[in-house]
C-alpha cells in the first residue's frame, strides 16, 4: 500500500492515509483523471448523486487548472475513515480573493473567468478549501463525506479538516 508518507515523508499532515490516486493532468488527460477519480470514489462507497457531485466538483477544479492555472496540474486523492479528500494544485497565478467566497451568488453567465467552476464546486461539495502556493499557483482541497460515516453536520467534510499533504512545507506537487 502506498501512503502519503511515501511521497512527502513522515512529517506529512496526512500521515497514515492511503494514497488512492496521484497524477498530473492537462487538457488531454482530464477525462482519464476524472474516470480514475470516479472509480476510486465508487470503490470507497460513493454512489449515485454523491458520486456525481464529488466527481463534478473535482472536474471543475481540474478544468480551472487547465484554463487558468498554467495548462494543467496535479491531483491527489486519499481517504480517511469518514471522507474522501482530493487535492488539486497548479502553477498558475492563483485564485483572486473575489472568487473564493463559494457561497456567493451565481457568477454572471457568459463571463469567462468569473468563477463558475469554483462556485459550482462549492455548491455540490460540502468541504472546499482554496489556498495560494508560495511562489505562485493555487491549491484546492475538496472533502466529501463517505456514506454512513459522517456528514457535513458532523464535521466530516468541514473545509478545515482537509489537510493537504505537505501543507506548511513543500506543496503536494513538490513544485514551489
Predicted stretch roles:
Residues 31-59:
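Conserved short strand/loop->alpha-helix "switch" segment adjacent to the catalytic nucleotide/phosphoryl-transfer site
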Residues 86-114:
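Glycine-rich/acidic phosphate-handling loop/turn and adjacent ATP-lid/helix
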Residues 65-66:
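Short helix-loop "hinge" at the ATP-lid/N-box region of the Bergerat-fold HATPase_c
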Residues 110-125:
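Glycine-rich phosphate-binding loop
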Residues 2-24, 123-176:
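Flexible, glycine-/charge-rich segments associated with ATP-binding catalytic modules
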Residues 79-86:
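Short beta-strand-loop-beta element adjacent to the nucleotide/active-site pocket used for signaling
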Residues 71-78:
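A conserved short beta-strand within the histidine kinase catalytic ATPase domain
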Residues 19-35:
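STAS-typified acidic loop motif
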Amino acid at each position: 500500500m502506498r501512503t502519503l508518507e511515501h511521497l512527502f515523508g513522515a512529517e506529512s499532515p496526512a500521515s497514515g492515509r492511503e494514497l488512492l490516486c496521484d497524477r498530473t493532468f492537462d487538457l488531454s488527460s482530464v477525462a482519464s483523471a476524472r474516470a480514475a477519480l470516479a472509480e476510486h470514489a465508487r470503490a470507497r462507497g460513493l454512489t449515485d448523486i454523491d458520486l456525481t457531485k464529488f466527481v463534478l466538483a473535482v472536474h471543475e477544479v481540474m478544468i480551472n487548472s487547465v484554463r487558468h492555472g498554467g495548462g494543467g496540474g496535479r491531483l491527489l486523492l486519499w481517504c480517511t475513515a469518514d471522507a474522501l479528500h482530493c487535492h488539486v494544485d497548479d502553477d498558475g497565478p492563483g485564485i483572486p480573493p473575489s472568487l473564493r467566497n463559494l457561497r456567493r451568488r451565481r457568477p454572471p453567465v457568459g463571463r469567462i473567468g468569473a468563477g463558475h467552476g469554483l462556485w459550482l464546486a462549492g455548491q455540490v461539495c460540502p468541504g472546499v478549501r482554496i489556498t495560494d502556493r508560495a511562489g505562485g499557483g493555487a491549491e484546492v482541497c475538496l472533502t466529501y463525506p463517505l456514506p454512513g460515516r459522517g456528514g457535513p453536520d458532523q464535521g466530516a467534510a468541514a473545509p478545515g479538516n482537509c489537510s493537504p499533504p505537505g501543507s506548511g512545507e513543500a506543496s503536494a506537487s513538490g513544485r514551489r
